[in-house]
Amino acid sequence: MGKKTKRTADSSSSEDEEEYVVEKVLDRRMVKGQVEYLLKWKGFSEEHNTWEPEKNLDCPELISEFMKKYKKMKEGENNKPREKSEGNKRKSSFSNSADDIKSKKKREQSNDIARGFERGLEPEKIIGATDSCGDLMFLMKWKDTDEADLVLAKEANVKCPQIVIAFYEERLTWHAYPEDAENKEKESAKS
């Protein structure tokens, strides 16, 4: 189970630590080039969900589970038509209290937030690359904004191949073998 430790401010000498347990990872975003996850805390309502930097978390299994679902959702969005019919939605069996309605609206809004190429922005450059659940992902910087998103490399290869090539060219290095260096020295000594 995921955990996050928080020291209480009122403890002077004993430094008591309070541990929060992550129940579920709900969403992912990039803020100033750092990955943050929206977390549902065990024993707390959805109004207490918080965005936390990846480096502060100790729940790799939950993050991995979320990324698998996130990846499937992304691939599904690319293959399915955008519009959904109202007739296919199920009604909830729970009561529609004010809290239920608010939390449902929050979930719908967070799911409606466009990410990556869905935002319709023009890619400027690739800042970095990472492996996420076995898939290569690029951190894409967009033109006319300071924001960046993780996008599937497969998608970037199709939508902006020249930017992908530029990213690889910037990082391309040539390594000479020792025999090559010796041969060049011999040739220059003969001249």
Swiss-Prot record:
Bias (Basic and acidic residues) ranges: 73-89
Residue stretches in coiled coil: none
Modified positions (N6-acetyllysine) in chain numbering: K40
Residue numbers spanned by region Disordered: 1-21, 70-117
SUPFAM superfamilies named in the record: Chromo domain-like
GO cellular component: chromocenter; chromosome, telomeric region; heterochromatin; histone deacetylase complex; histone methyltransferase complex; kinetochore; nucleolus; nucleoplasm
Lineage: superkingdom: Eukaryota
Subcellular location as annotated: Nucleus; Chromosome; Chromosome, Centromere
Entry keyword set: Acetylation, Centromere, Chromosome, Isopeptide bond, Nucleus, Phosphoprotein, Repeat, Ubl conjugation
A Pfam family the protein falls into: Chromo
InterPro entries per record: Chromo-like_dom_sf (IPR016197), Chromo/chromo_shadow_dom (IPR000953), Chromo_dom_subgr (IPR017984), Chromo_domain (IPR023780), Chromo_shadow_dom (IPR008251), Chromodomain_CS (IPR023779), Heterochromatin_chromo-domain (IPR051219)
Disulphide bond pairs: none
Gene Ontology terms: biological process: DNA damage response; negative regulation of DNA-templated transcription; negative regulation of transcription by RNA polymerase II
Phosphoprotein listed as a keyword: yes
Main location: nucleus
The Chromo domain, residue ranges: 20-78, 121-179
Assembly information from the UniProt record: Homodimer. Interacts with histone H3 methylated at 'Lys-9'. Interacts (via Chromo 2; shadow subtype domain) with the MIS12 complex subunit NSL1; the interaction is direct, involves dimeric CBX5, and occurs during interphase. Interacts with POGZ; POGZ and PXVXL motif-containing proteins such as INCENP and TRIM28 compete for interaction with CBX5. Interacts with LRIF1 (via PxVxL motif). Interacts with INCENP. Interacts with TRIM24. Interacts (via the chromoshadow domain) with ATRX; the interaction is direct. Interacts (via the chromoshadow domain) with CHAF1A; the interaction is direct.
Entry function: Component of heterochromatin that recognizes and binds histone H3 tails methylated at 'Lys-9' (H3K9me), leading to epigenetic repression. In contrast, it is excluded from chromatin when 'Tyr-41' of histone H3 is phosphorylated (H3Y41ph). May contribute to the association of heterochromatin with the inner nuclear membrane by interactions with the lamin-B receptor (LBR). Involved in the formation of kinetochore through interaction with the MIS12 complex subunit NSL1. Required for the formation of the inner centromere. Component of heterochromatin that recognizes and binds histone H3 tails methylated at 'Lys-9' (H3K9me), leading to epigenetic repression. In contrast, it is excluded from chromatin when 'Tyr-41' of histone H3 is phosphorylated (H3Y41ph). Can interact with lamin-B receptor (LBR). This interaction can contribute to the association of the heterochromatin with the inner nuclear membrane. Involved in the formation of functional kinetochore through interaction with MIS12 complex proteins.
The name this protein goes by in its record: Chromobox protein homolog 5
Source organism (scientific name): Mus musculus
Lineage, opening ranks: Eukaryota, Metazoa, Chordata, Craniata, Vertebrata
